[in-house]
UniProtKB/Swiss-Prot annotation:
Reaction(s) catalysed (UniProt annotation): GTP + H2O = GDP + phosphate + H(+)
One annotated GO molecular function: GTP binding
Name of the featured protein: Signal recognition particle protein
The keyword Transferase belongs to this UniProt entry's keyword annotation: no
Family recorded in the similarity comment: Belongs to the GTP-binding SRP family. SRP54 subfamily.
Enzyme Commission number(s) from the entry: 3.6.5.4
Keyword Transport: no
Assembly: Part of the signal recognition particle protein translocation system, which is composed of SRP and FtsY.
Stored InterPro entries: AAA+_ATPase, P-loop_NTPase, Signal_recog_part_SRP54_M_sf, Signal_recog_particl_SRP54_hlx, Signal_recog_particle_SRP54_M, SRP, SRP/SRP_N, SRP54
Organism: Mycoplasma pneumoniae (strain ATCC 29342 / M129 / Subtype 1) (Mycoplasmoides pneumoniae)
Binding site for GTP: 106-113, 188-192, 246-249
Amino acid sequence: MFKSMISSIVMRSMQKKINAQTISETDVQAVLKEIRIALLDADVNLLVVKNFIKAIREQTVGQTVEPGQDLQKWLLKVIKQELINILSQPNQEITSKRPLKVMVVGLQGSGKTTTCGKLAVWLKKQFQQKAMLVALDIYRPAAIDQLATLAEQTESVFFAKGTQAPDQTTKEAVKTFKESGCQAIICDTAGRLQTNQELMDELVAIKNELHPDEILMVVDGLSGQEIINVAKEFHNRLKLTGFIITKLDSDARAGAALSLTSLLEVPIKLMGTSEKLTGLEQFHPERIASRILGLGDVMTLVEKAEEVFDKQSLTKTVSKMFLGKMDLEDLLLYMEQMNQMGSVSSIVKMLPGNLTVSDDHVESIEAKVKLWKVLINSMTREERRHPKLINRDPSRKQRIIKGSGRKMDELNKLMKEWSKLQTKTAEMGRMLKGGKNPFSGFGGLGGLGF
């Protein structure tokens, strides 16, 4: 769905000058038709699409146009607000009630168990609260082992009772939870199909023992239209409080998954953005609307950077860059910190449309970063801090090649590009001092040699 780039449709369809003071049905007909096709291609539910197009038509047809008004920007603003309306529901955030009791449900293979681990990490990061993970999937022994591993990785308390009836295990877990000192209990239920009434009854029994504050359904972003009927059944039996949509970092169309919130009037509370345990984020309708329109998501990008980059060390690194004194150890630290923000592709998706990078270029950047890290990690600290030592001594190059398992021309290319980077960043520093734009005339991502 993020690939639909509705903004390009608007720009392409609104090229002709509208001379009349009032916008007519004919003026917006072409753009609405293309938007409808784009949304359906993204697997958005037909009813949601119809309501969306109707709302846009009602807000545009008959509206008075001010002389000189930018119609593209005006129409994009209307479209963005309607997207926000579709994606928004009351109680969008995880409840602030503590202690917090969460029941996680969903279809088989939707990623519930992994999401439970991610949720524990998210709660710890956002609220400094420790969680208890409860294994209730007695039909898949590997699920219990997986949750135990996740509990260890996330420093959470783990609770399981083997193949004991899940509702009885829940009852015992709640008692232990009250005495554990944990602020949240997260129950991982067995994956099931909506047609299996016996297992659905089991969920109801678990709910009656847990009395959860949140009942969250995990939905795969790759799901098709069938997920809507599935979610309706879960909601009818359990009264869901929210959805967690996974794989929104991929090229998944995600239209069906995102349609759920409008059709069921249940908020999307969290979204999966990577396979890492840290890859769970709060769902912000306005930010997702911006991504869908190709306007980027700068706020999330800034938040990620603030989490990863230490202000003092970043200031030091940037100062060295603009003085032309950035060494390979600085470059390695920079690449590792960028990696903590997410993959190159996930970062690129947050950039506004006019700053986007092609998929081929993204793959090229990711491959180059991986190669550079291998080569730099094969150097001594002295070599990283004084890269010119490598160029002066062929034996150092031979040792680095042998240790990294890479080719000599790859190392030579790294050294050449590092030298270019030194020159570029020093020039950028001089431009800054002169009050000029340091990024004009430089290619790649920020002109950093990529």
